[in-house]
């Protein structure tokens, strides 16, 4: 076996802020090339890299305390190094925010996953990371066929959810909801797929909007510390990611995800803002049409559709930020290889 790029592992070395990380590379006996660009950023290039090769970003740690994705990525990288994992796709593995991970917190100064638009933002540690990640994505996707580009941004939810795992497809100007992407979701046994209805400022949206990548934000269970995640809950996802990297068709059966559309985004407008439920409410909790579930100033917040459900409720966001998504279950179909709904 070729000498490892890592003293311990990709994840351990990334989190060890006491040791420096230098850019370096190695070629495995099977011809696969590993390039460590910087702390937490590893590029893997297959021996037979060509115009037909997929170019896949697998990112984790955008929120520092969401550790299950980091552990999944670390195991895949280890198996690539040993030769156990076949590599036919060019991959960029990212563990984004080790300082926040070591502090067991989502972020240090600013929510990193709201910094990938082109708006002016206040200086912060996270803004520096976002700018670096934008450059890395550009370099990775430059001179690659549009149809080869994928980005799976892996997260965990803060709260419990009626769907243990779910994926969010960002809204872009481009055809970024291909049948291949939906097939990936279904083979991963991800329980729900949310179709966003407006642009956002997330990492996956950035790749989809600016590089037409087939991109998802994937929410995998709940936040836990490294070593405390039950990775067996994500066996199907792990297998499907590995099959994607090997460019083979999964052998296990798919489980179709329930599809939702985002019906609206609740943005906090007033200091006097609250929900009528406590912080233990689950993602995808639904309401009857007309049911009041909170207020913003003197305006009641109420369900505008039967069984309209709430996702990512956060009563503590700053004024002007998203306080929740409201979603409705839909029947979707494919037109010209793209997932659409009426």
UniProtKB/Swiss-Prot annotation:
Q: Name one Pfam family in it.
A: AstE_AspA_hybrid
Kindly identify the residues recorded as the active site. Answer: 219
Catalytically driven reaction(s) = N-succinyl-L-glutamate + H2O = L-glutamate + succinate
| Source organism, top-level taxon | Bacteria
Supply the enzyme class, top level.
hydrolase
Q: Which terms are listed as keywords in the entry?
A: Arginine metabolism, Hydrolase, Metal-binding, Zinc
Gene Ontology BP annotations? arginine catabolic process to glutamate; arginine catabolic process to succinate
Gene Ontology MF annotations? hydrolase activity, acting on ester bonds; succinylglutamate desuccinylase activity; zinc ion binding
Q: Which cofactor does it need?
A: Zn(2+)
Fetch the Gene3D superfamilies from UniProt.
Zn peptidases
Binding residues annotated for Zn(2+), in chain numbering: 63, 66, 155
Kindly give the InterPro entries that the UniProt entry links to this protein.
AspA/AstE_fam, AstE_AspA_cat, Aste_AspA_hybrid_dom, SuccinylGlu_desuccinylase
Q: How is the cofactor bound?
A: Binds 1 zinc ion per subunit.
Pathway it works in? Amino-acid degradation; L-arginine degradation via AST pathway; L-glutamate and succinate from L-arginine: step 5/5
- Could you say which EC number(s) this protein's record lists? 3.5.1.96
Protein role: Transforms N(2)-succinylglutamate into succinate and glutamate.
Homology family = Belongs to the AspA/AstE family. Succinylglutamate desuccinylase subfamily.
Protein's recorded name: Succinylglutamate desuccinylase
Give the classification, highest ranks.
Answer: Bacteria, Pseudomonadati, Pseudomonadota, Gammaproteobacteria, Vibrionales
The gene name on file is astE
């Amino acid at each position: 076996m070729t000498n490892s790029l890592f003293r311990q592992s990709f994840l351990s070395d990334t989190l060890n802020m006491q040791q420096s990380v230098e850019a370096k590379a190695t070629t495995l006996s099977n011809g696969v090339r590993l390039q460590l660009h910087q702390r937490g950023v590893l590029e893997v290039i297959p021996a037979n890299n060509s115009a037909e090769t997929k170019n896949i970003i697998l990112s984790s740690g955008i929120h520092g305390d969401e550790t299950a994705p980091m552990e999944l990525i670390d195991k895949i990288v280890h198996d690539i190094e040993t030769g156990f994992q076949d590599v036919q796709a060019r991959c960029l593995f990212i563990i984004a925010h080790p300082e926040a991970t070591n502090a067991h917190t989502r972020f240090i100064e600013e929510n990193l996953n709201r910094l990938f638009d082109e708006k002016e933002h206040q200086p912060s540690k996270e803004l520096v990371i976002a700018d670096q990640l934008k450059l890395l994505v550009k370099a990775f996707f430059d001179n690659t066929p549009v149809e080869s580009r994928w980005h799976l941004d892996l997260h965990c939810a803060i709260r419990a959810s009626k769907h243990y795992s779910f994926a969010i497809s960002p809204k872009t100007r481009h055809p970024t909801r291909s049948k291949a992407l939906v097939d990936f979701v279904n083979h991963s046994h991800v329980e729900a797929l949310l179709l966003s209805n407006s642009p956002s400022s997330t990492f996956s949206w950035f790749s989809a909007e600016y590089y037409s990548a087939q991109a998802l934000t994937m929410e995998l269970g709940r936040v836990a510390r490294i070593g405390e995640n039950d990775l067996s809950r994500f066996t199907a996802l792990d297998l499907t990611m590995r099959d994607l990297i090997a460019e083979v068709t999964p052998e296990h059966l798919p489980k179709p995800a329930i599809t939702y559309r985002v019906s609206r985004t609740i943005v906090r407008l007033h200091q006097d803002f609250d929900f009528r439920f406590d912080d233990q409410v689950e993602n995808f909790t639904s309401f009857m049409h007309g049911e009041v579930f909170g207020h913003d100033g003197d305006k009641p917040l109420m369900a505008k559709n039967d069984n309209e459900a709430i996702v990512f409720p956060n009563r503590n966001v700053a004024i002007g930020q998203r306080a929740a998504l409201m979603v409705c279950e839909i029947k979707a179909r494919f037109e010209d290889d793209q997932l659409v709904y009426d």
